[in-house]
């Protein structure tokens, strides 16, 4: 059917499809968040190697980064941690998605190291950066940084990431310089 449409109609159909996918993603995120907050979903942390999880996330975002002219690097690690694979993937994917979305040129690095009683996963970018005054607010539900409001999004990705990671006994920190980029450090119990 679509092949019989005039070019302008096909463009409209494509635009409608893209918007419906964004709406579906938003609804899906809100449902996940609600279920997590209301205890309907429980996390099941297991002691697991991080490399396969990080490799999957890097592969998921590699094409999107390349389309934007970005380099995405995953540094090999032999670190293990205690986490729920499905939900930690969701949390880290939200952070990597933001890194790709808010980086216009440069690189995104994903690495993991041992840090005291935690495995620390660093996701660093050369993107827009976040002002010091906003760094404490970015994990608030629906908060959007002033310098990225023209980008698509509703401000629940980092909130959801923090909820997941804290539910696993971990935490997230951010270090950022406006115009230089950000490093999100995710700490998971070993």
Q: PLM features: what roles do these ranges have?
A:
Residues 169-171:
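Conserved glycine-rich
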